[in-house]
Every structure is written in C-alpha cells, then in structure tokens.
UniProtKB/Swiss-Prot annotation:
A single GO cellular-component term on record: cytosolic small ribosomal subunit
Pfam family of the protein (one): Ribosomal_S3Ae
UniProt name for this protein: Small ribosomal subunit protein eS1
Biased composition (Basic and acidic residues): 236-255
Subcellular location: Cytoplasm
Organism: Spodoptera frugiperda
Signal sequence, start to end: none
GO biological process: translation
Top-level taxon: Eukaryota
Region feature Disordered, mapped onto this chain: 236-264
UniProt subunit comment: Component of the small ribosomal subunit. Mature ribosomes consist of a small (40S) and a large (60S) subunit. The 40S subunit contains about 33 different proteins and 1 molecule of RNA (18S). The 60S subunit contains about 49 different proteins and 3 molecules of RNA (28S, 5.8S and 5S).
Keywords: Cytoplasm, Ribonucleoprotein, Ribosomal protein
Keyword Protease: no
C-alpha cells in the first residue's frame, strides 16, 4: 500500500460534490422604461439590471440602453398604419425606478418595405443630413414610388432621369425646411403622422404622381451635451410651476423686530 496524502481529503471537500447554483435573477432589479411626452403611452416596458454592488452602480448600467418600440404601442392603438413604424428610444437618465428615454431614431419594418416595392414602377430614394434648432444632427431617409395614371393605357409607369432628379431635389428641400426650423420634439411630432411625407407627395405631383411616400429611416448622428433640465422638460416634468409657492417672501416694514415671547 502506497503511503501518501489524499489531496481530496486534505482540502476538506468530497469528490463529485457540486457547487450551490445561485439564481442570477436574485441579484437584479426591474426598472420602468418611460417614453417622452410626445407619445400617448408613457410606460413602454420594463428592463433588468444588476443591483448596485461596490463600484458598479445600477443606474450607470442602464444609461445608453436602446429600446425599439412600435408606434402602435407608443400611441396605444391598433391602427395598422402605425404598427409598421418603429421608434428607437435611448436611456439618458434614471430617476428612482424610472428610466427616462429620449428619441434615438426611427425605422420601418422589413415586411412593410418589401410590400411597397413592386414591378413596372420607379423607386425614388433620397437622404440628407439636417440639424435641428436644439443641436441634434439627423440623417433622414425618404422613399417614394411612381404611380400609374388612371387614364394611362400603359402597363408601366417609369419616370425619366430628369424627373427622378427633380423629385429627389424636392424631397431634400422639404425635409430641410421642416427639420432645420424645428426642435427635436417638433420633428418627432411630425414623424408620428408622417406629415413630411404627405407634403412631399403633394409637392411632387406636378413632376410625376407618387404613391407610398414615407420617411423610411431617421438616424441621430450627433446630439448636444446632456442637460437634465431639458430631459425633464421633454418628459413634461420641467419647472413649469410658479416659483415660491411654498415659501413666498413676506413683506415687512423697515426696522421690524419679532415680538418677545413670554414663554418657550
């Protein structure tokens, strides 16, 4: 019999004993995701994050998260015209258990884009970088399709190259006009009903009739320096109330002295 130490027994543990499995969800907390006040439904969902432990702060782990929500969910309706439009919201600050988000972009669903593309027509696309009055640099993509005239006997409705260039120029002009003179809040309010695309369709009717004109995508390329006051205003929680309601300054004559109390 060989004489020697048993390494397994010297460590005080038994062979084959598994470690106790800890559920990772016990170390996490739920936070409510809040959309800006431009949308009807403010509570859009919940998100998980590890609790604050040591130098790892929970709120810092939440900042910068991007949430993609359908416009139908944000507006709390079942309208099919809203369901294919997706808005991206980015977490900028945490107040208690609420994650305050800001607009981070917009896109269309893939099935909607595939449905719009058809044969015997011309697809016209345009994109331009524009800056809002409050310092957000946006890249806006627009798409449109030529429409067949009801009186035409042709099978196709192709536009000429000069007409395509004129339509693209008109798209860029209208997008620049509507975005550069507006703040981000006003731009989002225009994207919800897609009023910019409707203006483009009306303006281009004289060049060539269009159909299914829409703002296909919006990217936020650059944003101004973060300010908590502007974010709170975006969520409808800015300092709109009157100042000094709780402690107004009382008017007293000069040389006023408070009366001496007889007992305390």
């Amino acid at each position: 019999m060989a004489v020697g130490k048993n390494k397994g027994l010297s460590k005080g543990g038994k062979k084959g004993v598994k470690k106790k499995i800890v559920d990772p969800f016990t170390r996490k907390d739920w936070y409510d995701v809040k959309a800006p006040s431009m949308f009807t439904k403010r509570q859009v969902g919940t998100t998980l994050v590890n609790r604050t432990q040591g130098t790892k702060i929970a709120s810092e782990g939440l900042k910068g998260r991007v949430f993609e929500v359908s416009l139908a969910d944000l507006q709390a309706d079942t309208d099919a015209e809203r369901s294919f439009r997706k808005f991206r919201l980015i977490a900028e600050d945490v107040q208690g258990r609420n994650v305050l988000c800001n607009f981070h972009g917009m896109d269309l669903t893939t099935d909607k884009l595939r449905w719009m593309v058809k044969k015997w027509q011309t697809l016209v696309e345009a994109n331009i970088d524009v800056k809002t009055t409050d310092g957000y640099l946006l890249r806006v993509f627009c798409i449109g399709f030529t429409n067949k005239d009801s009186l035409s006997q042709r099978k196709t409705c192709y536009a000429q190259h000069t007409q395509v260039r004129a339509i693209r120029k008109k798209m860029c002009e209208i997008i620049t006009r509507d975005v550069t003179n507006s703040e981000l809040r006003e731009v989002v309010n225009k994207l919800i009903p897609d009023s910019i695309a409707k203006d483009i369709e009306k303006a281009c009717h004289g060049i060539y009739p269009l159909r299914d004109v829409c703002i296909r995508k919006v990217k936020v390329l650059k944003r101004p320096r973060f300010e908590i006051s502007k974010l709170m205003e975006l969520h409808g929680e800015g300092g709109s109330g009157k100042r000094g309601e709780a402690g107004d300054k009382s008017e007293r004559p000069e040389g006023y002295e408070p009366p001496v109390q007889e007992s305390v």
